[in-house]
Amino acid sequence: GYTDFNFGRTIFVESNGSCLTSTIDSYNIEKIDFVKIDTEGFELRILKGMTNVLTYQQPNMLIEMQDIDTYSAIYDYLKSFNYHMYWMPVATFNPNNFKKESKDVFGPRHGVINWICSIKQLNTTLQPVVDRDDTVERMNWRIRNNVGHDTEHGE
């Protein structure tokens, strides 16, 4: 099945136990330069637990965007700290994978959506996340049609 080819996996399990949590802010780390967030839909909660870090340390970040329904809220939250966001989609299948699996069970249109986030505007070939309603489809349309990010998009 699908999980036989999954090179990492997410499994949600109902539990009656408890989980201790700490916010990043609670650790009082002196300097944080870079943060990677891959939390399967809990990205906004993580960001809200690092308000002081975002305000005073302003680290660069890579955020795996799990749920398209949260893009707008995450965009708004990061913009409130003056962050710039850039699309960094990554194909799910890599023929040089650890298991040496040659079959791409995911298909050519399947991948992971990441945002690169920086206080500074980056000189990059990555496409910017242009507004709270931007999507990978809009970004791909801009690339295919060789138009700037301030041009109306097609669907």
Kindly give the residue locations of the regions a language model identified:
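Active-site beta-loop-alpha junctions enriched in small/polar residues
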Residues: 66-68, 91
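Proline-aspartate-enriched helix->loop->beta-strand connector
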Residues: 58-63
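Binuclear metal-ion centers of metallo-dependent hydrolases, dominated by the metallo-beta-lactamase
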Residues: 74-155
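Short internal loop-to-helix segment that lines adenine-nucleotide cofactor pockets
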Residues: 2-57, 68-73
